[in-house]
Amino acid sequence: MDKKASRLRRATRTRKKLQELGATRLVINRTPRHTYAQVITADAQVVASASTLEKEVRAQISNGGNKEAAQLIGKLVAERAVEKGISKISFDRSGFQYHGRVAALAEAAREAGLQF
């Protein structure tokens, strides 16, 4: 089993558990060049999202694949979720290690008002 298959296996396991709980979750995805985040309800509706591909985000950052960009995405997605009335969520790191960009996004989301 290679690294990607292991990550996807962890992600599937986590998503299944969160689905059973019926929790609203903050899902992240990262690529070498970009970072993406979505708040998804228990019935699979996307409530809020943010990514480094958005025009307003691109204007503020020079590179979409670093911690500064992840912090901005975390802050944006949290503000958008709180605006829609969602403050308590579960963090779905999509099998990625809680380190670097993933941790930076999570901390920024916590500071902006999300509880997890």
UniProtKB/Swiss-Prot annotation:
The record's listing under Gene3D superfamilies reads: 3.30.420.100
- Kindly list the cysteine pairs connected by disulfide bridges: none
Q: Name one GO cellular component term.
A: cytosolic large ribosomal subunit
The protein's UniProt keywords, in alphabetical order, are:
Ribonucleoprotein, Ribosomal protein, RNA-binding, rRNA-binding
Molecular function (Gene Ontology), one example: 5S rRNA binding
A biological process term (GO) from this entry: translation
| Top-level taxon in the UniProt lineage | Bacteria
Q: Please indicate if the UniProt record lists Heme as a keyword.
A: no
* UniProt keyword annotation of Ribosomal protein present: yes
Q: How does it assemble?
A: Part of the 50S ribosomal subunit; part of the 5S rRNA/L5/L18/L25 subcomplex. Contacts the 5S and 23S rRNAs.
Q: Into which family does the record put it? A: Belongs to the universal ribosomal protein uL18 family.
- Task of the protein: This is one of the proteins that bind and probably mediate the attachment of the 5S RNA into the large ribosomal subunit, where it forms part of the central protuberance.
Q: What is this protein called?
A: Large ribosomal subunit protein uL18
Species for this entry: Psychromonas ingrahamii (strain DSM 17664 / CCUG 51855 / 37)
